[in-house]
Amino acid sequence: MHRVAQAIVEEKTRVIDVDLRSYFDNVQHALLLKKVGRRVQDTAVMHLLKMILKATGKKGVPQGGVVSPLLSNVYLTEVDRMLERAITTTRRGKYTHVQYARFADDLVILIDSHPRQDWLVKAVEKRLREELAKLGVEINEEKSRMVDLTKGDSFSFLGFEYRRILSRNKVWRPQYVPRLKKRTALLAKLREIFRRYVSQPVERVIELINPILRGWVNYFAVGHSSRCFSFVKDWVDKKIRRHLMRARQRSGFGWNRWSRQWLYEKLGLFNQYQLLRREPPSKAQPTGSVS
């Protein structure tokens, strides 16, 4: 995430938001095994890997498996190398005109906004298609798009929604928050637990929802998630209060009956919604400049 944020600070505001068509279903086993075999010499490990892949036929990586993210990353290493070369060959001193970030099939490429780099957008896109074609992977034309952050557009990467905002100091800064669909999915999962365990003691409900909340918050704590966290916290608070009141066959939320402190300290409801603070990215200084 920091790599993307840094690129936005450096005015790489033209973003190729890449969506790969049915990526996990189209990983070619022969190519994948060849790539893994260059690094793994253990025959037992290679045999186990073949057995795992065999379950999906002649191509595809089983989603949800322990090794699936690793295999999905390994398969696109040539794409990484191509983009790293693009960064190196277009570098001018300390400043780069291209940056990218990828995890498995989630890929974004950020390019300098200056008109002199218009050619670079087409060149990178062309080379990307060439490398993907060698791997039997296609770009989903309907979902892939070119984003211009200077026009207020946004793009998503690894569950975060990125955009560029003007700070109080009149400096353009990146902002990345949890995507709305991620928050919606979280609340749907929690709502199902409240529904399924409506007649169970509140302690049992909290025992089930706390690990879900902890994992979700820990993941999104690196972003500008305070407003989203406040929404989730209030939503869970109300759900717990309704559960308690329903058990007493009463309406309302029991605002005067139970304090928030009681919910967190007495019942043990998850309450660690703190953000992980880190130094904001700064613009790279070109070679020879005075810092």
Spell out what each predicted region is.
Residues 59-63, 191-205, 216-228, 245-249:
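Short, solvent-exposed helix-loop connector elements
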Residues 43, 47, 74-77, 180-184, ...:
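Alpha-helix N-cap/helix-start motif at coil-to-helix transitions, marked by capping-box chemistry
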Residues 135-201, 212-214:
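A conserved non-catalytic segment of reverse transcriptases
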Residues 235-239, 244-291:
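Extended C-terminal regions of large enzymes
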Residues 54, 72, 76-80, 84, ...:
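Amphipathic alpha-helical core segments of compact helical bundles
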Residues 2-149, 154:
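Conserved polymerase palm-domain catalytic core
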Residues 100-103, 142-152, 209-212, 229-237, ...:
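A glycine-rich phosphate-binding loop feature that marks nucleotide/adenosyl-phosphate handling sites
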